[in-house]
Amino acid sequence: MLNHFNFKLKRDVTIIVPGEAFVSNKRVISTILGSCVAVVLCDESNNLIGMNHYVLVRSDLDISPDQRGRYGIYAIPMLINAMLENGANKSNLKAKLFGGTNFMAKGSVKVGLENSEFAVHTLNKYRIPILAKDFDQSKSRKIFAFPENFKVIVEYPDGTKVF
């Protein structure tokens, strides 16, 4: 995790890397995604957002507790719990999902697709509404999530979009 002042946004930003999650009511949260997925949760009534960044859905190996955030099967419940521990109300949670790019050759393992489908399935299981999904299969992206309005700015190599 890296905290810095972003001169373009004129804001304090916390950048998370694969395996990390962060919850805030003040700081913008950012990450860079390819095949990984970021789940961004918000409780607007409590002005709270959280973001995770997971690499794969699961692993067949034993995972040490400090590495669980790298796997969606752990990362999504961990983010939900972190939101609740920071004052969110589960019935207020809403989600936006990003990433899931497939850079590999046609016919190879589709890690990005598996990651994105898992996020949708898991949030549906938890009955958390998904307000936006950005799973364009061909583009990497950098995302910035804002706690005050749940706006997420997505920067692609060829432009910007707001969700």
From Swiss-Prot:
- What reaction does this catalyse? L-glutaminyl-[protein] + H2O = L-glutamyl-[protein] + NH4(+)
Q: Which GO terms describe its biological process?
A: chemotaxis
Q: Name one Pfam family in it.
A: CheD
Which keywords accompany this UniProt record? Chemotaxis, Hydrolase
Cited CDD domains: CheD
Domain of life per record: Bacteria
Tell me a Gene Ontology molecular-function term this record carries: protein-glutamine glutaminase activity
Enzyme Commission number = 3.5.1.44
SUPFAM superfamilies on file: CNF1/YfiH-like putative cysteine hydrolases
Q: What class of enzyme is it?
A: hydrolase
Q: What does this protein do?
A: Probably deamidates glutamine residues to glutamate on methyl-accepting chemotaxis receptors (MCPs), playing an important role in chemotaxis.
Q: So what family is this one in?
A: Belongs to the CheD family.
NCBIfam families per the UniProt record, alphabetical: PRK13494.1 (NF010017)
Identify this protein by name: Probable chemoreceptor glutamine deamidase CheD
